[in-house]
C-alpha cells in the first residue's frame, strides 16, 4: 500500500518543508539572542508549531496511514493534520527568514497579524493540489526571496507567476538576468492573460537565501516561449496578443527538443518520448514512454487495498483520438505536454548548463476517479541489456539489486521505490528519480515501470472493510537520467550492493528539496534586506548531507534550549561515472569537515558527538574541532551556536 496509495498526501509531505523550517528556525533562534530588539522573535510559539508538525508527520508514517489502509474518514483526518502542519511550517519559515534577512536588525519588529513574507503557492483544502499565486508588479522593485534547502551552492531554474509580461528580474547583485516568459493555460489550448509564468536561473548560496527583485518596465528584454499545438481540427495560426501559437494536425513526423547535452524525439501522434541522443558520445538510445492498465482477476479474491491480483499482463493504454499535444520552445526550457483522458503527461528539458540540463523532468497529473477496478502504470522501454536485474533504493539510503523472476507471479516482481530506481548494462545506466514513493518493476529486459494510481471497488478481506475509491487528482514528479558508465567489470553486476553516481545523488537532492520562493507581503515600505544570506562558509562536500539542524527542547517546558542537533549523512557513491563538466559546485574531502570553518555568520561554541537519537552521549564525549565520517554513515552531534 505504501508505494501505491495516497500519492497526493505523499506529495504534500514533500511540500511540508519540515527540514527547511527546522534549520531556519535554529539559525533564527541564535540570531534572536544577539540583541534586545530581536528578542521579540516568537521562539516559544514557533517551537510549539514545529513540535506539532513533527508529530503530525510522524503520525502519518503509521502503518495504516501512509499505506492508505485506513477508512476514508480516517484518511481525511490524517490529511487535515498534514494540511495544518504545512500552514504552520510556512509560518515558521516566514518568521525565521524575517529576522535573518533584515539588513538592520534594529529595525526588526514582529507583528503576528501581518506576516513579513508570503509563499508563492496556496492550497485551498487538504485534498487539493497547491497552485501558484500571482505576484503583482509595479515600477517599484518587488522583492522575491529564494531559499535553497540544500547544503551545496546551487544554480536552479525557478518559475513564478506574475501579472504582467513587461517584466525585468534583477539578481542579488543588481544585474538583470535572462528571463523566459511562458503562457499560463486554462485547459489545453486557451491562454489566460491574467497571469504569465516567468522562468530564470537563480544562483543561491548553500542553505541560504538570494534576494531577487521583480519590476515592471516599458520594454522588457524577456524572451517569449513559442507554442505548437497538435490537434485534430486545427486552424493554422491561433491569434494571440502576445505569444506565437501555431496549430498543427497530429502527424507521423517527430517532435524534436534539444539542449547541449541531449536531443529528444517524440511521437507526433501521441506526444510520448521515443528516442534520446546523448551528445557526449553521439549515441542514439531508444527510450519509449507509454502508459498501461492493470485490471483485476475474475476469481473470488480480487485486488484491494492490501492485495495486487492483476488479470495478467498490463494492457496498453489505448486512445481512440490522438491527444492534444502542446509543445513549448523557450530559451530556458522546452516541453511537450500530452493531454490524455486520465493523465496529463509533461516532459520538460532545461536548456541550462550544469545539473538541471542533464536530466529530463517528467510529471504526470493522474485522474482515474471514473474507473472501475483499474490501475495505471507508466512504462519506459529501452535497449539497455539489464538481464532481468534492476535496482531500487531502501529509504533513500542504500540501493538494493532486485531480480525479476519468471517463475514468480507478476505481483511478486513489484518492489518499492522511495527516491530512485535504475537499470544498467556495461555501457549505460538509466535512473528514474522520484519525488514520491511508488511501486516499481522491470518485467522485461531494458524496461522500468511505475504504478501511479489504483482504484479498486471491493474489500480484499484483510481487515479494512472497504475498497479504494477515495482517489484524488494527483501529481507525480520524476527525473529521467541517462549516464555513461566507465570501466565496469562483470563481477560487479553480481554484487549485493550498488551506489548512485555523485550526479545522481545531487539530482535526487534537487528533486526532493526544491527551492522555496517567497515575496514580501507588503508592496511598499519594506525595510532594507540583505542581498544574500549565507549561513555556511562554503558548500558542504558533495557527499555530505545535513539531514537536519534541529533545536533541542529544554528540559523544563515545551520551549527551545540553547542546543541543537546537527545530523549528518555521508553518502556512498559509485566512482565509475564521470564528474567532469557536470556543473557540480562542490568537492569531496574524504568525509572531513573543520568545525570552525562550517558556519559563516555564527560561531560554533561547542560540538559534541551523541547517539543518533540524542538519548546518550559517549562517556569520553568532548568538544570536536573536526568531523570525520566514513561513507554511508549517519552521525548526530549536539551543537551550540553563538
Please give the residue ranges for each predicted region:
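C-terminal (or distal) subdomains of carbohydrate-active enzymes
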Residues: 15, 94-642
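Metal- or metallocofactor-binding catalytic centers and their adjacent structured scaffolds
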Residues: 1-128, 140, 489-501, 507-514, ...
